[in-house]
Amino acid sequence: MELLPHEKQVVEYEKTIAEFKEKNKKNSLLSSSEIQKLERRLDKLKEKIYSDLTPWERVQICRHPSRPRSVNYIEGMCEEFVELCGDRTFRDDPAVVGGLAKIQGQRFMLIGQEKGCDTASRVHRNFGMLCPEGFRKALRLAKMAEKFGLPIVFLVDTPGAFPGLTAEERGQGWAIANNLFQLARLKTPIIVLVIGEGCSGGALGMAIGDVIAMLEHSYYSVISPEGCASILWKDPKKNSEAAAMLKMHGEDLKQFAIVDVVIKEPVGGAHHDPAAVYRNVQNFILQEWLRLKDLSIEDLLEKRYQKFRTIGLYETSSESGPEA
């Protein structure tokens, strides 16, 4: 597993404990109580390191090569999954994986953005950057879910929509805008979960829903830290400062009412215990489905409208404003 800078001290401590345990099998250098004392120190070290991460360190966790992707969540959560392909206009976009899913007996339309896990799959998936056909594919499956009365789950994980010339020629901006318009009035419950990167319009085109959630170390932002640093300071190396300024993680976004729920990850990030993350996400999806299914379609759509209508709307006291 690839190590992040802040993980090196933890890994070295873990190796030391493992070596002591191995040697103890032969020579009994340390008692079991002494080993347990070392393990408690390790737990405290982890707590100290991972409770004081900078925004940029959390971005690095979010981008870890071993972090679970949409296909991993499908395998880890779904009893059944039937993939559906194509946008019925141009071609299939491998950056979107979607289909009919069953989670603990309940059927969903599950649609996820997929980056890939190795060089070959990342190239095949275009590194999770959607083309217009990817957004059309997602919308086609969403409308199918509406037709058959299925709740929708969107898994968001993209560095952004593909900015290439061919994508622009096929109407990239319109495809994203049309998704926003159509999903806002879709007559079925929509649950959105940002599992990794949620960057720019590429994320927003699949993030209109009745509840928006994020994993603890995922991020949701109008631009990447590197892109922001390049624009503001003409220096992409100022990504750490940009990550802090963008307020891109769940705690800040929840305060701004942009996201509703932040789901805890295992210590160190989702890649340290994927099975635990799958359970947490599965429980969240089922819990939200139980809450949303009792709403009438009229109430569902009105709440969805009000949710997005009030984002970015702030009131200030007249006393703090300029005098007339």
Swiss-Prot record:
Sorted keywords for this record are: ATP-binding, Cytoplasm, Fatty acid biosynthesis, Fatty acid metabolism, Lipid biosynthesis, Lipid metabolism, Nucleotide-binding, Transferase
The Gene Ontology terms for molecular function here are: acetyl-CoA carboxylase activity; ATP binding; carboxyl- or carbamoyltransferase activity
Which pathway does UniProt place it in? Lipid metabolism; malonyl-CoA biosynthesis; malonyl-CoA from acetyl-CoA: step 1/1
Gene Ontology terms describing biological process: fatty acid biosynthetic process; malonyl-CoA biosynthetic process
Where does the CoA carboxyltransferase C-terminal domain lie? Answer: 37-291
Q: Name one GO cellular component term.
A: acetyl-CoA carboxylase complex
| Classification via PROSITE patterns | COA_CT_CTER
Q: Which InterPro entries match?
A: Acetyl_CoA_COase_a_su, ClpP/crotonase-like_dom_sf, COA_CT_C
Record bears the keyword Ribosomal protein: no
Name where it mostly resides: cytoplasm
Q: Which reaction does it catalyse?
A: N(6)-carboxybiotinyl-L-lysyl-[protein] + acetyl-CoA = N(6)-biotinyl-L-lysyl-[protein] + malonyl-CoA
Entry's localization field: Cytoplasm
In the Enzyme Commission scheme, what number(s) does this protein have?
A: 2.1.3.15
Pfam families assigned = ACCA
Gene3D superfamilies on file? 2-enoyl-CoA Hydratase, Chain A, domain 1 (3.90.226.10)
User: Which PANTHER family does the record associate with it?
Assistant: ACETYL-COENZYME A CARBOXYLASE CARBOXYL TRANSFERASE SUBUNIT ALPHA (PTHR42853), ACETYL-COENZYME A CARBOXYLASE CARBOXYL TRANSFERASE SUBUNIT ALPHA, CHLOROPLASTIC (PTHR42853:SF3)
Protein task? Component of the acetyl coenzyme A carboxylase (ACC) complex. First, biotin carboxylase catalyzes the carboxylation of biotin on its carrier protein (BCCP) and then the CO(2) group is transferred by the carboxyltransferase to acetyl-CoA to form malonyl-CoA.
Q: Which family does it belong to?
A: Belongs to the AccA family.
Q: How does it assemble?
A: Acetyl-CoA carboxylase is a heterohexamer composed of biotin carboxyl carrier protein (AccB), biotin carboxylase (AccC) and two subunits each of ACCase subunit alpha (AccA) and ACCase subunit beta (AccD).
Question: What name does UniProt use for this protein?
Answer: Acetyl-coenzyme A carboxylase carboxyl transferase subunit alpha
Q: What is the scientific name of the source organism? A: Chlamydia caviae (strain ATCC VR-813 / DSM 19441 / 03DC25 / GPIC)
